[in-house]
């Protein structure tokens, strides 16, 4: 199962970063291609993503784990969606660990298990996943500083 991991140490406390990571409403500010977030509930939300051609696409997620200010994990709901043809599983995990007195190590993992013939392109999925996590860390860093 392709898993991509990225991490970075930011100059902000875990609580400061959690205020952003723990609230899906903030995703458009730091997560790549998210135009807006709708239907936010305690354990679910919908990301409205913008494709490269500018077309909005909705993606539903369930929060699988949330322990402030340490870990947040969410998984995409794939059944009966256009994503189901390509992905068997897609989930994101963000872990926050104190680093010194005022820093936080932000570790992200993206698990994407591809389906069927899409397995042949799994190296491309990993490459895109690395870009996505790097862009997410860049966005988070821009919000909290380094």
Predicted ranges, named:
Residues 28-32, 36-39, 54-105, 111-113, ...:
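Hydrophobic-ligand binding "helix-grip"
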Residues 1-8, 15, 91, 99, ...:
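Hydrophobic-ligand-binding modules of eukaryotic lipid transfer/binding families
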Residues 45-47:
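N-terminal glycine/threonine-rich, aromatic-flanked beta-hairpin/loop signature
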């Amino acid at each position: 199962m392709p898993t991509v991991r990225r991490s970075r140490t930011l100059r902000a406390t875990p609580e400061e970063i959690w205020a952003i990571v723990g609230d899906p409403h903030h995703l458009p500010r730091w997560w790549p291609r998210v135009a807006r977030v709708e239907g936010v509930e305690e354990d679910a939300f919908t990301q409205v993503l913008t494709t490269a051609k500018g077309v909005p696409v909705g993606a539903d997620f369930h929060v699988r784990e949330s322990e402030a200010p340490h870990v947040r994990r969410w998984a995409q709901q794939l059944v009966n969606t256009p994503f189901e043809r390509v992905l068997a599983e897609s989930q994101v995990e963000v872990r926050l660990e104190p680093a010194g007195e005022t820093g936080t190590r932000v570790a992200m993992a993206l698990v994407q298990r591809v389906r069927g013939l899409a397995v042949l392109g799994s190296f491309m999925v990993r490459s895109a996943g690395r870009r996505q996590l790097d862009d997410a860390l860049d966005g988070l860093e821009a919000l909290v500083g380094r």
